[in-house]
Amino acid sequence: MSSIETFLQMVKESDNIVFFGGAGVSTESGIPDFRSVDGLYNQKYDYPPETILSHSFYVNHTEEFYRFYRDKMLCLTAKPNTTHYKLAELEKAGKLKAVVTQNIDGLHQAAGSKNVLELHGSVHRNYCRKCGKEFDAEYILNSKGMPVCDSCGGQIKPDVVLYEEGLNQQTLEDAVYYISHADMLIIGGTSLAVYPAAGLIDYYRGNKLVLINKSTTPMDSRADLLIQAGLGEVFGQIEV
């Protein structure tokens, strides 16, 4: 039996699946991956992306932060791909209980997923730091320089977790809950290099830990099933 056939059999036998995904889930929708060879970290800017996407850079160089953010982080024309849609189908069928994602693009919800735990926030939520008014991603995209609140003139910040910022505690606790209760944990499209997110797999207690990634990860030896392939290729074969 091939590794993909084994995977399909596992999905069939499971009814408490959790999917934990990273940038590789959205690359097939045309959204750049930070850490892949042709990803954002290997492109040339005045500052490395991890510096630009930090809290201190946002505070001290807000306009420059937003120039990069609009250019590279707001991919509003991107559409969900096969993996997003299959995960939504699995949830609708009652087999998948949660999607835990490191992505900020909102494509899981666009595909129909309901229970999505966004560890790093979402580009679709933005708020005024002064009065708390919320704004959508289009407002940010269409504004010039530093976006300001149309009610009070306050500075607007995206609801995304920047470097030097902590993850939302409730989202983390929810992720731990779902992963610790899962009978199958599928991890896809993540280098498993960012903590505390990568540490979440320590909470999985089952024997169906599946890693789907084109490249190797530090956790490969812990997987019950390792599939080195594109996510779309694998998920495209699931029949719900």
Task: Walk through the language-model features, giving the residues of each.
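Conserved catalytic core of sirtuin-type NAD+-dependent deacylases
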Residues: M1-V240
